[in-house]
Amino acid sequence: MSDDPAFLALGTEVSAKFKGAYCEAKIQKVDRSLKVKVSLKESPFGQMIVQDNDLPNAKFEINELTDVVFQRKFIRCQIQSIKDQSKYHVVFNDGDEKELRRTQLVLKGGKHFAADGNLDSMPLTNPESFSTPVIRGAAKRGAQKIRNAISEASGSRGGAVLLHNDDDENDEEDQEDGENEEDADDDDDDTEEQQQPRERRRAAAISAIGVLKKAIEDTQSEESSADSSEERERARSRRKRKDEASSAVTSDEEDQEDLATTDSENPVINGASSAAALSKTLQRKLEKQAMKREKQRLKEEEREEKLRLKEENREKKRREKARIMELKRLEKVYRTSNARIQENHEKSMTQIISHRSVRYFARFSDLKHRRKKKKLYLHEHRQKVNSRIRNVKLYFAWRFVAHKARLSYFARYALQWWRTSEDQAYSLIRTEKLLRSQRRRDWVGSWLEGLEREKIRFVVIHESYTQARRILKYIERGTEKRTFAERCDIEYEDIESSTVSSHFRDQEWFPAVLFPQVFSDENGSEGRQRIVRHMGNGQLVQVWEDDLVPFDWLPEYSFADVTAMTEKKPVEMRRKFKLAWRFATDYAQNRLDARSIRSILEWKFIRPSSRRLKITPIPVQAPSPNRCGEDHDDLVSTPNESDYDSDATIKNVDAETKDLFVAMLVQFHDAHNSVIDTNPTIQGHEVDLYYLYELAKKTGGPKKVYAANLWSDYAKKLVPAATDAEEELKTIFKNFLESYLAINTKLSWPMESLQPRTERKVVLPGQYSESRKKRTQAIMSQVQTPPTAPGSSKKGRVGSGGTRGRKRKVSSESVQLKKRNRKSSSRATTASPGPSEDRFSFQRPQDSDDVTDVPDDMTDHEDLLPEAATRKKYERKSQTPGRRSLSSRRDDTTPVSSMAAAPPKKGRPRKNTTVTTPVLSVPKSEGRGPRKEDTTTKFVRANVLSHILSGQKLRAFYGDEWFRANAIEDATDCTDEIMDIMLAHQDFFTPDTPRLSPSAIQDLDKVLKKIRAKTHYTGWNQRYDEFMKLEKLMVTVEDQMIARGRFRHLPRGRELKAETLALVEKHFRADDEDDGVPKTLAFYLKIAQEALSLSEKRAVADDDESSDSDTDFEQKPDTSAAAAVNGGKSESEEEEEEKTVVMGGDEEAEEEVKSEDVLVESVDQESPPTTSQGTTTPETAATGGLESESDEPEYPPVPEELVPPPPVLLENFPSTDRFSSGGSSNYPTLSRQGSINSMASPMFSPNSDLSLSGPLTLPRSGPLTMANIRQSPTPDEVVGSLRKRLSQTSESSESSELPPPPSAASKSKRIRRASERSIDSASEHHRMMRSPRILTTQHSSGALIFDISTTQPTDTSGPIEALSVRKPGRRKTVFAASPTLLTSGPLTLSSSAPPPPPASPAPPQHAQKTLGRPRKTPSTSSRKPEEEDEAEQIPTTVVGVTEEASVADSSAKEDLTSEDGSATPQDEKDDSESTTTTDTITPKSIRGGKRRRGGGRFGGSYPVKPAKPGRKPKDPHAEEGADEKDPEDQTPTTMTTSTPTRADSFQTQKNRMAKLMEGKPHDYSFLDLPDFDKIIEEAPKEDINILMEERTYELREIFAQCKADLSALEKRYRQQNEAKRKAEFAAKTASSAAAAQASSSTCSTPRP
């Protein structure tokens, strides 16, 4: 309509369109938008269409004058037309809301609501009151006729109305109304009979109007005004009150009507005037009452609205106040954090000032009136004295560029920033600006995908190859056709022309990245094809090389030209074209730093915390114990102090120590041309580098830190308020502390390297260490367990091999120790957990495939353990962070009985002490809820090489987290297809381009998309199974290794190269971020070689494999228990467990061997361990018995064939066929598993090859008693047996003498070592004769005695034979007929004892303990020539100096006598083979021997200096023995390389050594060292540092040994010179005295 407004206001009642019908509604919200057409009244005149915003103060009506903005000025105009484009948000009566246009709304005006009353009068709300439809006449007559009819009816029946009842009154009124209507309607042709029913219906409808009209209006108004449920409730209450008021008013009106009708004095003329007057009065009263009710309603609504607004304002103020308080709190915390960080930065600046400089120094400004805070400035020295800094300029230069590149906290460059030029710095800044956006980094990363480190080369790709050929033909006109390399060498100036410029401006082209691969045509044509990546769509395109146009040919275009070319591209390609143009142009012009592009793409940009950070920053440093009582800030939450109990010493270290650490760290990085921020932050919280370094140092080296994966624990201690700070903390450690910790852990300091690398304490004589207590308790626990049948299920049995449901016995201490070892595993790797985790595992019959550590619910049964066991804590920690002794790993498997045994008293442990303690069993954890996940299991991302089988453990990715899962079905097997693709790729593979071809990548991607694995979540949703892609799965390292090796078993598996497998692995694991170290192609090549060689190792079977299986079957009839433990292990894991353990190997070699189920042998304490029922333990169990801390190998073993023997043993090396390895009857020899009958071969066999030998085993034996020690023969028997052997040897010198077959007792006692076995091979025999092996290091504790049994002259030497034996508490290496079985002493060299002369009486000896340490016997060198000749025929014992035969005889006689003084015939038989007498060489005399508890590196440490005797011995050569203290009072010595001596004088030895050294260079080959250059060339790169470290230690020991030997030689030389001088002086004195006596006698003789 013309009178409608331009737009509708809020609250306007309209008729809105809803589902095709118009319903009543009210406008609630308006989004105004008017389109106005105006005519300008001023220049430039005309008409224009503007928006309502352009008419700021206009009244939007037609023909209204206003001002419009045109060309930044106001012009007078007139509105011509208005078009409403607004959006109206309306609310209908029933509460529905909708947004409509103006065309869907209609105002409530006269056109639609003119007959308001008639519409309401229609009987639509009461259908029961009418039976026929309403006629049109009643609607047309209007309201006036209705009112007249009512007045007529009421006037004609005025007095009689009150006398009739309601029904009669209604009937009469209807009748009268019908009559009056008939009189009034003169035009109606109907009869009176026909009109009466019609009038009655009309009267009934009119009467219904009065009752329903008000109710309908109130309902409609209330529903339209009710916007919420609360308003509807208020409307109901108002409606109720109105109904009550209307009823009261209605009653009053009726009374008034009656009174007015009754008291009316006006004459009634047809009843019309009184009725009209009454109706007007009634109408006025009704109107007044309605107005009154309306006012009352408005007042109530206003009152309620005020209350609502007041409540809303109160709530709004409360929220605003809370928001302001929160902002103030955050601002306070933010300022505090910034102030603390700023203070730490200033502190770091002062810490960096640690070097001297000549030019620069730093100072703080004192301009307090300008700045409130001091600032550090850099100044240049003029006097060039007392300078402080060199690194400040470096620091400022680096911070400037890093700040520009936003790299101050999370990136580190290897560049020397102080040498960076301005152009280089700006190139870095330009590179960072270009790659600042995440979208740009993604695009550039996709363009460079597939390129390793090559220089990027760009080309131009045309939409049609004809366009490219046209421009190439134009440029190469008049010349020969060039190759692509020749085109790239053409300068731009040579081709610059308008034609070239217009070509690139008009044609369709796009930049592309060129790949270096070159492919020949499959059809056999001469052309070559290249691979390019389209920088618009990112696809790989294979094009002819002749059609490539170098990007350098593009001319320099202006900004307008570039914009025009960009506009020609499709809309979705414009942004990429612009970025590609910019990137390629800047890169070609060297405006970008090519070295930092990939670094920036690999960075994780971490945004600094803003003021809107919701996480409250908490100081990093934990509160110290002495500040616990102080008041803390309410804004700073105090972390849990239990997390810092173990690190209290690190937290509370003084500031001087931290400053010293920071200074050394900065100096270290400065030496490596790098600068660090000594106060790094994570999410606004500072990280204490000293704290992090100490935590990592306690764990071990960097490899152990990465393998332990304790970043979450470190983050809780360092930054407890930060969330998900593990990766950032790992980055900080890698950038700041990794190299520094590696240097300090491996090489350490020179003074530290001179100290013995052991964790043992110095044990004084009589002192008893904790490790001895523990070993004694362990052996006592074995002794107290009685032997039972293998198949019995007795609960008291420990380690029975035949029981199915045996239980493991553990204690609370072992549980705590196991938890600690999870965090600090020794020599752990990322591929497999350490051996300490599998040495003592728990069986779970229902989950046999999962071998885990001690379950969590084991702690619930601590009340079952003894009080002492639960109260005791493991306090013996490793003192050397880089290594861990074997004892600390063996301690993890200590049984409960050993822990529960009462601690013995200090001193030597008793032999036959037994403690009976009931063995406690911890209940199994079946049905106790979910077990804790084994955190040591390593997972890697699955790729196309993975082969997922049913039951494998997986990790599934859902949302933003990895969950535990299991494979319930085998994944799609595409092994053959993958194999074909890899073999096809090998045809194009070249060593110069180690990368996959694009076709192989596409084929492998297709295969990867086909592979699906059906998994079952165990950590997120356990109700459903799901088919998942390999990209969202992780598999274990062991399963991935098996999957790689399965390609070797295919028919063409031998053709597959490890390089191809490594390339595929690297391509699909390029984005693997789970590993701590960066993965290179060499890493993947190494694991590929291991995987492919794994199947070959399976094919190489051991010689005694069948016997091993037979032995195991006989000894373990029921192997279900062992299968329950190893059931979940793969074949590769079982093979890893069966690796041969080299005796004397390093820790790393030993830890790689996984131990099997350790079966503890039951030992009878009354009988020797000769029963056949005892189970044979694996080699790992035998080595596990080395519980002494001195058993830890110092260096990794060197192959014996590479190490020649000592130079003294090289000359006249005797035949090795006569030496037996059978050992003694008391101590069995070492041999293979199940091959006990092959013990008669000699020890130094030429065919012994340990590299192909199987696993070595040692049987576990019980405690040794005097009943088990064979009795030593008498000296006469010794001499007789020796003479017998010498005569036999002289008779058959060429033939080898074999010992008698071993007895049954010796078979069951000890199995031979690999070094004592032999194979028959002549070539190996000659090789061993050329380069005989040196002694294998026996890592045991106790006396190490070498028997030299030979018939050669005294200037020759034979091999040294060593036998290993077990005893309570430690292992020792002893020999046949040795009296020092249970004693400890230094290294002793002894030869066959000579028969003592019968005429020489033995000097008296003091009483000596049978099992005590060997005492040193004073020796003399003043012998007669006849005695020396006899010594050459029958050599005597050599102890550094020559000793008398009588002394040796007496010593042998005493030592070879048992406690009861008798010798058994079996002992005499054994002594016939090798009979020796021994004496000891003190540490100071030979400086060698086994390193023992408390000993030093070079011959042992002496806590008390030996006192020299008060008087000199009669024998001059006895001074050496007098200078030394008795070995009983000395501490053990360390193990060093011994220097054998000869049984001759010092001069003879000196002359022989001079003859040997003549004409020979002093190089490594003469020092018995292998060719180190050759070892370095053959060794992998990652092992070079370890080999150099080992060589350093070896050279140090050689130097120390030589120095010690030289000192001993000099001392002996001085002693002999002194003795010679004294002898000469005595002879001279005697001769002079004789001469004087002769002269005196001559003088006194009387003359005849």
From Swiss-Prot:
Residues 1195-1208, 1393-1404 have a biased composition (Pro residues). Residues 1165-1185, 1377-1392, 1474-1486, 1531-1541 have a biased composition (Low complexity). It comes from the Eukaryota. Residues 861-878, 925-935, 1313-1326 have a biased composition (Basic and acidic residues). Keywords: Nucleus, Transcription, Transcription regulation. The keyword Nucleus applies. It comes from Caenorhabditis elegans. Pfam families: ARID. Residues 150-270, 284-307, 763-935, 1095-1563, 1628-1648 are annotated as: Disordered. Residues 166-193, 219-228, 251-260, 848-860, 1102-1112, 1145-1154 have a biased composition (Acidic residues). InterPro entries: ARID/SWI1_ChromRemod, ARID_dom, ARID_dom_sf. It is found in: Nucleus. PANTHER family: HAT-TRICK, ISOFORM D, RBP-RELATED. DNA-binding protein which modulates activity of several transcription factors. Plays a role in the modulation of endoplasmic reticulum (ER) homeostasis during chemical and pathogen stress, including exposure to the Gram-negative bacterium P.aeruginosa. This is AT-rich interactive domain-containing protein arid-1. Residues 261-270, 1213-1251, 1348-1357, 1542-1551 have a biased composition (Polar residues). One of its GO terms (molecular function) is DNA binding. Residues 655-745 form the ARID domain. The gene is arid-1. GO terms for biological process: defense response to other organism; ERAD pathway; proteasomal protein catabolic process; regulation of DNA-templated transcription; regulation of transcription by RNA polymerase II; response to endoplasmic reticulum stress. GO terms for cellular component: nucleus; transcription repressor complex.
